Amino acid sequence: SDYIAMGLLCGLVDRGVKIPEQVEVISTGTSDIDIYQCLRPSLSIVEVPLEKMAYQCARMLHAIINHEVLSEREVNLPFRLCLGNSTLG
């Protein structure tokens, strides 16, 4: 989660670990959390559409519960990579 990645990043920096040279840190979540920009180094994020993902999961689960045939078994949703300074990429 975002908060685990932030805690990990801060803990590594406090212990003198060179980010991203020795360890790279990336999180999944949303880039609208302002604290990401305050972290040093800034955190890289794979932004996933959580609301769309939850909607699709609920829709598919509803179909399964009602013994309906699923129109698809896999749903591809867009993501966005927001590079910070916690990764080399």
Question: Where are the regions a protein language model picked out?
Answer:
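Flexible loop/turn connectors
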Residues: 2-89
